[in-house]
């Protein structure tokens, strides 16, 4: 049966709602669709805005590859199924089998910023399309964050991707612009706060949000800072918990809920329950007016307290907490990565990933990864 001759605009509108992984397969069915899916940046942005989103858990393998898992929270028995392995060939080596040693991954807009502690270079990678952009840095390090500036917030396709970062050796903020393919220094904008590793940072609507701390006469203050790639400025964001904390290294983590809200994992000390707080929907009209709601309170046994020091996901509607932790059993020589799912009843479901933990790497959860057709 021949395909109906639908108007081009209607076909584009329908395709923009098809999940990216299925759309990529459809591109081989006809040349117009192939051009639309692979060569049209405007459609890529429209598709990212419209397409259905999915939870994907990313974990580091021992060989520095990434495996991805789909998390299914429907039914009485939640699961985390392996969806496949991602490989990133390193063009620096002649042998195509050699791969870039990824230590940390930062996610924005369907793109992955992959960094290595031992390299003066990084790569931005779209795992779905295979597009990569390799970028030289001035020093080794992994405190880099991907985002975008946008002059007209109403035009989705007018996004300029950028990378912001700072080195441990100094207080300067560096910013890389994809359009100019160059780095520049932003002087005098870094707040007088201590910023921890990038797993305490997330991207939401193109901005980077990060937990920070400062030593005061009263002890240690906890702060949430946002970096706006359009204004190139940091700004404080209100927190729902007391600012005083024991340290920044405790059970304080950030995540993103369905690409619209921030989530905070907070535990004041080892004797306290862990609290999961979620903001209102953050968009261009929020203008710093952020409100928080506590959606979960977890009281787990002492041997499971390590769950509170990992990256996490939270399903606000189902009131479920998800994290990845590296465990070492008494009889084992190696650590293994495990996925944990905890409900509001504090019942813990443990899923063994079947993977040994990578030395020097934390098992990574991307807050909400959405496979996309986005171009850099």
Swiss-Prot record:
Lineage: superkingdom: Eukaryota
A Pfam entry, by short name: F-box
PROSITE patterns recorded: FBOX
Residue ranges of coiled coil: none
Stretches assigned to the F-box domain: 1-46
NCBIfam families attached to this UniProt entry: F_box_assoc_1
Family annotation (PANTHER family): BNACNNG10540D PROTEIN, F-BOX PROTEIN CPR30-LIKE
Protein name: Putative F-box protein At3g18330
């Amino acid at each position: 049966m021949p395909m109906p001759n639908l108007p081009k605009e209607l076909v584009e509108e329908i395709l923009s709602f098809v999940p990216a992984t299925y759309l990529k397969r459809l591109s081989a069915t006809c040349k117009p669709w192939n051009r639309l899916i692979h060569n049209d940046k405007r459609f890529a942005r429209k598709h990212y805005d419209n397409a259905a989103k999915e939870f994907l858990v990313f974990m580091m393998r021992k060989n520095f590859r990434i495996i991805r898992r789909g998390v299914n929270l429907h039914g009485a028995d939640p699961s985390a199924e392996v969806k496949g392995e991602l490989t990133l060939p390193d063009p620096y080596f002649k042998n195509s089998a050699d791969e870039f040693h990824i230590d940390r991954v930062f996610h924005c807009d369907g793109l992955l910023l992959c960094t290595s502690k031992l390299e003066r270079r990084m790569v931005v990678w779209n795992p779905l399309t295979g597009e990569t952009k390799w970028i030289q840095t001035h020093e080794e390090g992994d405190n880099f964050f991907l985002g975008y500036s946008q002059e007209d917030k109403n035009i989705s396709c007018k996004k300029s991707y950028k990378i912001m970062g700072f080195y441990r050796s100094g207080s300067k903020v560096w910013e890389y612009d994809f359009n100019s393919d160059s780095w520049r220094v932003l002087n005098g904008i870094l707040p007088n706060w201590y910023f921890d590793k990038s797993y305490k940072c997330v991207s939401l609507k193109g901005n980077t949000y990060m937990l920070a701390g400062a030593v005061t006469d009263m002890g240690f203050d906890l702060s949430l800072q946002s970096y706006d790639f359009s204004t190139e400025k940091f700004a404080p964001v209100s927190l729902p918990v007391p600012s005083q904390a024991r340290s920044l290294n405790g059970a304080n983590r950030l995540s993103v809920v369905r690409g619209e809200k921030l989530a905070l994992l907070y535990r004041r000390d080892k004797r306290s329950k862990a609290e999961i707080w979620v903001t209102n929907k953050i968009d261009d009209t929020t203008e710093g007016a952020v409100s928080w709601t506590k959606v979960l309170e977890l009281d787990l046994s002492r041997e499971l307290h390590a769950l509170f020091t990992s990256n996490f996901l939270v399903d606000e509607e189902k009131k479920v907490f998800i994290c990845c932790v590296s465990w070492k059993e008494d009889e084992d020589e190696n650590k293994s990565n495990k996925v944990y799912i905890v409900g509001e009843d504090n019942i813990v479901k443990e899923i063994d990933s079947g993977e040994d933990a990578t030395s020097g790497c934390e098992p990574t959860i991307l807050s909400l990864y959405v496979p996309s057709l986005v171009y850099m």
